[in-house]
């Protein structure tokens, strides 16, 4: 009789432990499923500067996040977007400036939650057009600068990331015969990116 009671007690204890472990696993899985978007250990994301498509161009970027750090590779073509209007110090009303297909490298750090401060290096090729003659010439510029933006997640995967970029570059001039074009040393440009988090690993 005592052996039978002892056996039943052992079974009850083992069953309770099993259910306790199952509940613990369920709690952990639930916590993971409700974790914040900025709490990931690592993630792979793809995104696009969607306004470029509205002007007949395109933009694609793929990024990898580790803890607070983020690296992105991008390619941009601005179509008919006139980037000369973004020039701060010496933009010219006599010329237009268009983004031709250009690559870029971005390195960022999350200051707080999804607020990202980043720097970049973009090997831009601009097509410069003189308005009065329609003559077009290419200008190559290695641009750097700073950006600040915030990822607003819609659910677990999709996000909208508005921000502001400050582009810096050295002096460059093109001779159009009747006039010289000097590219602005500083561009100030708002940006709006749409993205998808393809994969993530929780902390």
Functional labels for PLM-detected ranges:
Residues 163-167:
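Short, loop-centered acidic/histidine patches that primarily coordinate divalent metals
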Residues 170-179:
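Outer-membrane beta-barrel porins/channels
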Residues 152, 184-203:
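Outer-membrane beta-barrel "beta-signal"
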Residues 1-27:
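Bacterial Sec-dependent N-terminal signal peptides
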């Amino acid at each position: 009789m005592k052996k039978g009671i002892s056996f039943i007690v052992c079974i009850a204890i083992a069953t309770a432990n099993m259910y306790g472990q199952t509940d613990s696993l369920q709690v952990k899985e639930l916590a993971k499923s409700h974790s914040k978007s900025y709490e990931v250990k690592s993630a792979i994301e793809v995104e696009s500067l969607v306004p470029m498509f509205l002007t007949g161009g395109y933009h694609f970027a793929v990024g990898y996040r580790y803890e607070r750090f983020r690296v992105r590779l991008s390619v941009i073509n601005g179509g008919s977007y006139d980037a000369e209007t973004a020039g701060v110090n010496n933009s010219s009303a006599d010329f237009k400036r268009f983004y031709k297909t250009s690559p870029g490298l971005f390195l960022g750090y999350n200051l707080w939650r999804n607020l990202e401060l980043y720097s970049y290096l973009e090997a831009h090729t601009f097509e410069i057009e003189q308005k009065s003659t329609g003559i077009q010439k290419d200008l190559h510029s290695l641009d750097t600068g700073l950006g600040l933006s915030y990822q607003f997640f819609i659910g677990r995967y999709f996000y909208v990331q508005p921000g502001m970029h400050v582009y810096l570059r050295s002096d460059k001039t093109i001779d159009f015969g009747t006039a010289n074009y000097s590219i602005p040393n500083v561009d100030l440009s708002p940006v709006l990116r749409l993205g998808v988090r393809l994969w993530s690993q929780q902390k």
